[in-house]
């Protein structure tokens, strides 16, 4: 007899599934007779199941919030939070419509959040609905059009701007000044320190505030992007717009393609970033972010100064201006500049054209979008208070006019992007074109004669060389044994040593030996801050009271000159808030010294591995330090003019300023990479044991992934408070990586955390954030370089709790004791013991 399908049984199962779904979620509508409770685990879902609204508790804490997140994206990404500053303290909260308002009630039936619509504005009955573009609205139940909206979440953003959402001032909708405010931390939705605000005076622009202080300025809207965001390049699926009229001054964007999801968010560390979901990679991709480097800091170079990240010092005076204060030893242009010659205001003044610039702060400006550049110049010359002018729109050759009537500050120069800025200067500071032409002609003739003489001399020298025996000097043998960059640096240092009084090569302020001797109390041991592989670092004070750190190169070091020239060459061109700042150098009396900014809190290792000082490093400070180091490394790998591999990242090479801001230092081992290069090989393996990647320590192969490995080791050291090198666990583990990996596999990750953090945080211990950091650290120290993430991915993982993080594979140099050493009664080794090349009895440590 044939088997007959049991259709009744199938229908019953289908009925149960439908019934379960009905009790699990709501539709997009939410009526006055319904309620949403935490205990029921019910949610409201938009019609196309793109967004979802419900209660959530980050990090499995006791704090409950009402929020909106992407349902269609597998990673939980929150885009709006209702009661961010007044969470529910238990899981007995309820959302319901009460008195024609959306209200959240706690377990005692007390309201903790409400839409606060007054009675006169409400038309009964009302309903709530979650729309497909992420807007949660309270509306007239008989009118589902925008005209029927009584309240909407889009008017009260948190840290995220969605498609069709507005940021800025909107008097049209009732006087809303919509701002973004960051989460306090990645696991705490409460209002953080950072916010975006719009200034409508002059030429409107957005500012990022850290509490009450401005940290970054977007620059004015130039028709297709903001002046200070050159990375805000047009993409085919995003339409950006900026509306400015009597009713509103707002920025918004629209994602014009289906199945593409993109957000603008303000992170808990103050980064404004554009993220787009990549379906293939199942992760958020960071398209751009701001602020990006030291030049993005607000008013970094003072009045009439401009910042250029590719020069040293980064602050420069506009032509026709000079530094406000000439310091006796080291010049500091951040104080600003002043005019060399006073304006005449009689029509003889002219303009200096600055290309590829970020426009100055536009608070004191006047705008006329109806005239062109020529009329703008004429208008500027007629008013003596006019200091500069530019186009308001850079599209189609430029149009409109903006005129500055006060000081010019917060200007920077870009390698790419930016626009022309015309700065008014006195006639005497404008070089006559005819004189300039004569100089060029004279210089050309002189150069031609010099080249001819050089050719003749070279010809006779070459003939003489053919008759002589080639002699290889010891220094040439040494040079040939080095890699290509070191060849270049040794040659440069040799040629430079014979010309110690010339400054063209370094483009840095040079100081005399006696000035540094005086500043450091004749290099007194009382002024000694520390000692590295190539010399001693002293604390010093200049005559103007400025504190400095002086790195005095050891005369006994055979490699010191190479590293000195390398460090000068690299750091002079690197400017970032998380990189140590080089102020000058000294090549005098047979000595070579570097002068850095003095950082009050010394190196990270002096705090991290000190039993007393480590108590000052709570988890939030450690997390901020981790983020800062990551940003500095990302700048070296991706955002600087030349790609740089540090090769010696470790705790002692991270310095801390008075605010505990981390700054990567010691570039003596660093290598410059071409943009197309991915890895290089060297026969001279340098670095520090405990931080070297396997491929570098064993084969001399290094790349960005080598630095990522070092960063991973450092991250795990910061979390655990233990050194990787010299770590000794008498039971099973011979290094920190093995210790962390074993606890990770056993599900006991939190046991590796420095106990000081656990004691300090007690009930508010951010478990989820720390677990993410441990996982990121393990990803960075994976044995195979291709498995490790790049630093841009690390930054995204650190900055967003919603980003998917892969499961890590075995770390490099992860070695544990064999079972014979652990327990003499056992003759077998555990299968999950992590080894390298099956060696279990040898001590193998990351170099």
Swiss-Prot record:
Glycosylation sites: 29, 41, 92, 116, 171, 256, 385
Residues at which ATP binds: 529-537, 551
Segment forming the signal sequence: 1-31
Molecular functions per Gene Ontology: ATP binding; carbohydrate binding; protein kinase activity; protein serine kinase activity; transmembrane receptor protein serine/threonine kinase activity; ubiquitin protein ligase binding
Domain EGF-like: 291-327
Keywords per UniProt: ATP-binding, Cell membrane, Disulfide bond, EGF-like domain, Glycoprotein, Kinase, Lectin, Membrane, Nucleotide-binding, Phosphoprotein, Serine/threonine-protein kinase, Signal, Transferase, Transmembrane, Transmembrane helix
Keyword Membrane appears in the UniProt entry: yes
Catalytic site: 648
Name listed for the protein in its UniProt record: Receptor-like serine/threonine-protein kinase SD1-6
Origin species: Arabidopsis thaliana
Organism phylogeny: Eukaryota, Viridiplantae, Streptophyta, Embryophyta, Tracheophyta
